[in-house]
Each structure stands twice: as C-alpha cells, then as structure tokens.
Amino acid sequence: MLPTLLIVTGARRIEGSSYEAEARVWWTARMLVLAPDVVIYGDASGPDAWGHEFATTRGIPWFRYTKRGTIERHDGAPVRWTDQPPPAHGDNRALWGAWLLHRDRIMVRHAAKRTDRYDVKLVGLMASTPGTGGTIATVNRATALGIPCDVEVF
C-alpha cells in the first residue's frame, strides 16, 4: 500500500461564514479518515490554511504553493514552481485570478506525477455561493488527471 499524498483545496469564502463550523467538522473528519502522509495546498485562508494547521500540528510533511511563485516546504528553503514573476501587487483581479489558476494547475500536475510513489487524492470544500471558480477548476483538473476527489459543497 502506497502512502497518501493529499491535495487540499477549498473556497476561502468559507472562512468566517455561517457554515464554517459545519464545513470544518466535515473537512477534519475526511482528513482523519484519509490519514495523509503528505499534504499539499495553496496559501489562501480557509481550507488551505486548515491544511497547513493539520499537517504542522501532526508532523506531516507539507508543501504550500504560494501566490508569489514559490513552494514553501516543511523541510527546507522554498523552491520556485515557476520561472515567471507573479503579477504586481496592484494588478487587476483578472490577472491575479489567471495566475492563481495557473498555480493550482501546477500544484495538481506536480501531485499527479507522483502516483508511482503515492496514492494521490484530493479533498475539497466548495461554497454554494459564487466565487472565483478556483476550487472547481482544481477539482476538475485533478479529475481529468485521474486523481480521486472527495468534495463537499457548503
């Protein structure tokens, strides 16, 4: 049996919402059942931050794909996930949205390349209200690459 590499994704609008507590209970239960050996996630609030907290409090190796173009690692200095610079601080929302979707595609692609060493899975939390579409795009990319996805909508 291969160790589990778990991609965490989710709508940041869940953080601070009226359904955050319910979403977090579901998410924590899924994390405990899936028992990841490695966790990877982005750097948004909400489920991404929960993934970091889950991994660090349990001593699980983690990799955080940041909007600055780096992968922060549990075991060393950050490395770049791209040679391109991120948009400037004041750039428009559409440019940043495209950049973050690109980041999420890279994150999923990196995980998919490790299926020879890991049982790669994804756990995702989606908000029932419209957002940027980043979570569903990440889930769709993972599904297209054959990664099983455990997703719930709140």
Where are these regions (language model features)?
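Acidic/glycine-enriched connector segments
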Residues: 2-154
